[in-house]
Amino acid sequence: MILSAAAATAEGQTVATLLRADSLRNAGSYAEAIEAYREVNDKKGIPGSWRLRALTGMATCNRQTGNYREALENYRTIDSEGLLDVRGKLNMSNLYLTLGLYADAVDLLEPLNATIGQDTRLINLASAYAYLGRGGDALQLLATAPTDGMSAEQKATLTANRGFIEMSLGQHEAAAASLGKAAGMLAEGAGRYIVMANLALAESGCGHADKALAHIDSCLTWQKINLGEKHPDYAISVRKRAEILLKAGRKDEAAEWFKTYFGLMRNYVCRSFAFLTDKQRQDFWFSNEPLVTECYATEAADPQLLYDVALFSKCLLLQVERNIEAEARRDTSASRLYDSIASLRREADKGSSDARQRDSLYAEADRQEQRLMAMMDGYRSFNANMRLTSADIARRLGRNETAIEFIRYGSTSARRYAALTLDGTGKVGFVPLWTEDSLRNFRLTDGRTLNEAMNSMRAADKNAIYTDTKLSSMIWSKLKPLLTKRGRIYFAPDGLLHLLAIENMTDAMNGSDVCRLSSTRELANDDKDIRGKALIMGGVSYDECEAKNQDDATAAPDRSASSILSALRLPPAANGAYAYLPATAAEADTIRSMIAKGSGIKAECIKGTQATETAFKLAAPSCSMIHLATHGFCFADTDRPEPLAFCRDSLREDDTMSRSGLVFAGANRMVQPAYSAYDDGILLAREASEMRLDRAALVVLSACQTGLGPITSEGVFGFQRGLKKAGAGAIVASLWNVDDKATKLLMTRFYHHLLGGMPMSEAFAQAKTDLRCHEVKIEVETDEDDKSHGQIRSLGRWVWPKKKVMKTVRPYSKPQYWAAFILIKK
């Protein structure tokens, strides 16, 4: 076949683009490589081998940048076109394991007849079995592996994997034998010492502390010389030495090694996170956070270390949301420096037998990093926030102020809680508290457990929680002696305490003001100024809306909530509807009027059919105060909708951020396909996270369930996290469904005190007190007959009516009305 000149030229250009993409990939310029591969893949009529090369290249780049789901989609596309070979399926199985899709990995690998890569198939399938709790099947599978034809390295890998699985099953003696055999089969090198480090843990599990320490010390010696102290493998071995000492009961020594590990890990995160994608950061941190916080088990050995770890690890990902790469790309010089630093660190992290060359690469990267920080305020503040210590926080505390980091540690079956207390002198205390089981199973005065009451939607159960003095004492009594009378307490919760408003259980706390924070790290930052512009939305019309403002939107409509709600058969997508909230219109009007009276804040109030999702997206970024009075929702999944289903640790942000949201005008109608050109009236947490709310000093969510969400070390993955990611400051949110009228009164009192000059946390606490003590007069009957009028007929006979008197009552004194709302300082 003879090609025309034009066709030959087009073919040549395609080949050139493929070669350029390969070159970019090899150079580590993955984003540019993906664009080049995509350009090839989008061409029509190209040979299947070219398309395979382009899609495989995209998958490789996506995998390297942590975009594992995109990489998986690339392989699925290859498979759909009939181009996926055995190697591709093995790569696909690696992605399934990385993403935690173990059942999918089993479905892919079990029927696979691999003539090549049989060792990879067996190892990956065994790993999937082990993660699914089928450890016995995993070991049986590895036992059937044909070793004929395997290289010594492949045999060693197979044996090492058997050891890893045996160790996960608690079979430490067998694991030690397998790992020892594997180590003996491997040549001197990084791989051998990774196996040796795990052998050390297996020996520790057998109770052989001296053997374990000898193995781990040999690893540390080799890694320090050949990889350097900045290499992740060295840090991992340092941590494993700490774990061995901890298991042997040598807590003081363990704390010293954990301290070294924490220093190495913090430096690694500070060096690396600015050069990682969001997904790479998430994958790294969700895997490593439990390891960083293992030191909590050393308890009172070094409380200052534990406080610094809590300060660093809580909400870490929120601290690095700033897109350093995007900022660097705005300036040519900064962009070049960014790329140079990334390249130097990649090369140094590969490890080298030439220690001087490796150290030279690290040193040059550090020098260039100092130059980049001098050029970029964002990068400088990024590093400063990551390196805060308890001493930095102590300097921000007043004489009568105390900071508390609650921590949770231990295995899932035996989790414990403790409090790390910090005062203005810099002294850190460790206070052991309770186990998670004892807290969940605490028996309230009405006979129900705390776990049952928190899962319940009944108002009586909420009242039982927040009026139980024994529960309040259990939570706070051990901390009371450490606190100054009538001082201020700043606390950052952990675990179950995210879903429990313990600041509303402080009647016995010496009259202290209690303020909730995401992390006490926030004390190092100045509060944002609420003065500026306020946005108030309420009285939302859920049946109708004015959709015209979509024409002014800067982005295409986001209708992802519609499909999610439809799939889960939740309103309004599944023949349900959100009801109008009459008190929210008056709430919005009152707050606007209060703000307008001499506060110097310009207020915009949007109500009724105009209170659309699009209107919010357009108006909110320029506002310093935002008040949203509407419906809210949060759910875990269709099988586990109760609140405590959120207390899970292994969660992916992209899933959980689509399970909470707020409802805007027209939502009952706009979710229907006929309105596909417009926003659907449901603002998900994920959508909120993509907004720019840096100016917002305060966001008030006068709505139900806005404080709920799955719990991780990063805090609550609900709507509040979406706002935090968007840059919002303080947030008012709710833990359960709230009363319409009580909420209106609470919010108006809050703004009354806040605009009157009261500090935000005090204004919020006083507003709750006002609501509890709010009095109204009602007419009630007495037992005395009223003979001033004639008799009345009742139940077939004539009787005197009862006298009526006016009585003063407090209709909102019960916690069901005021305890749901929490103020979270970012």
Place the predicted regions along the sequence by residue.
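Amphipathic alpha-helical segments of tetratricopeptide repeats
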Residues: 40-42, 79-80, 113-114, 143-147, ...
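Helix N-cap/loop-to-helix boundary motif
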Residues: 48-49, 83, 116-119, 150-153, ...
